[in-house]
C-alpha cells in the first residue's frame, strides 16, 4: 500500500520535511504503508536524498502532467489544501489528510480544510501534528463526497468566501 503526498504548484517545504521525519514514517508503516510517494513541487532541496525507516520506500518527483493515477493508486493522500487537489482526491473516494500551508498570505486553505473536515469529508492537521492527523484519519469513518454533484463543493466555497 502506498501514501501519496502532493504540495501542488506552490512551495510547501514544511510539509515535505514533516512527511520525511522518522516518527511520521514509522506511523505510516504501522498502518501498513510500505511506499511513500512525494510530489514535492519547488521543494527539491527540502526533499533532498530522503532517509527511510525499515519497511518504507520513498520516491519523489517535482511535477507530473497529471496526478490522477497517483491518487488512484494510493491508500491515503496527504495534500496541501488547494481546492483542485482536495476536490480531485475527494472525488476519487480516497482517504484524505489535508495540511494547509499556513505560510500563505491569504489563508483560504485553512478555511476550506476546516469546513470540509467539519462536514466529515476529510481530516485536517498542521505540519506540527501530522502524526496525530494520520492517527485520527485511520479509524475515522469519513462521509463519502457526493459524486458528480458540484453543489456541495460550491456551497463550501461560498461559505468560505463569506
Curated annotation (Swiss-Prot):
Main localization, broad class: endoplasmic reticulum
Pfam families hit by this protein: Glyco_tran_28_C (PF04101)
EC number: 2.4.1.141
GO-annotated cellular components: cytoplasmic side of endoplasmic reticulum membrane; UDP-N-acetylglucosamine transferase complex
Entry superkingdom: Eukaryota
Record InterPro entries: Alg13-like, Glyco_trans_28_C
Reactions performed catalytically: an N-acetyl-alpha-D-glucosaminyl-diphospho-di-trans,poly-cis-dolichol + UDP-N-acetyl-alpha-D-glucosamine = an N,N'-diacetylchitobiosyl-diphospho-di-trans,poly-cis-dolichol + UDP + H(+)
Entry annotated with the keyword Ion transport: no
GO BP terms in the entry: dolichol-linked oligosaccharide biosynthetic process
Subcellular location per the Swiss-Prot or TrEMBL entry: Endoplasmic reticulum
Keyword annotations: Endoplasmic reticulum, Glycosyltransferase, Transferase
GO molecular function, one term: N-acetylglucosaminyldiphosphodolichol N-acetylglucosaminyltransferase activity
Function of the protein: Involved in protein N-glycosylation. Essential for the second step of the dolichol-linked oligosaccharide pathway.
Assembly notes: Heterodimer with alg14 to form a functional enzyme.
Family indicated by similarity: Belongs to the glycosyltransferase 28 family.
The protein, known as: UDP-N-acetylglucosamine transferase subunit alg13
Source species of the chain: Schizosaccharomyces pombe (strain 972 / ATCC 24843)
GN (gene name): alg13
Amino acid at each position: 500500500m502506498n501514501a501519496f503526498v502532493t504540495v501542488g504548484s506552490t512551495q510547501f517545504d514544511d510539509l515535505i520535511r514533516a512527511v520525511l521525519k522518522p516518527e511520521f514514517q514509522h506511523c505510516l508503516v504501522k498502518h501498513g504503508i510500505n511506499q511513500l510517494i512525494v510530489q514535492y513541487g519547488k521543494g527539491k532541496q527540502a526533499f533532498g536524498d530522503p532517509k527511510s525507516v525499515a519497511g518504507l520506500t520513498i520516491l519523489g518527483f517535482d511535477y507530473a502532467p497529471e496526478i490522477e493515477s497517483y491518487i488512484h493508486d494510493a491508500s491515503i493522500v496527504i495534500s496541501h489544501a488547494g481546492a483542485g487537489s482536495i476536490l480531485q482526491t475527494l472525488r476519487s473516494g480516497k482517504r484524505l489528510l489535508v495540511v494547509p500551508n499556513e505560510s500563505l498570505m491569504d489563508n483560504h486553505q485553512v478555511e476550506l480544510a476546516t469546513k470540509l473536515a467539519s462536514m466529515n469529508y476529510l481530516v485536517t492537521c498542521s505540519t506540527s501534528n501530522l502524526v496525530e492527523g494520520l492517527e485520527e484519519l485511520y479509524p475515522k469513518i469519513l462521509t463519502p463526497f457526493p459524486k458528480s454533484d458540484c453543489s456541495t463543493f460550491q456551497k463550501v466555497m461560498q461559505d468560505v468566501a463569506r
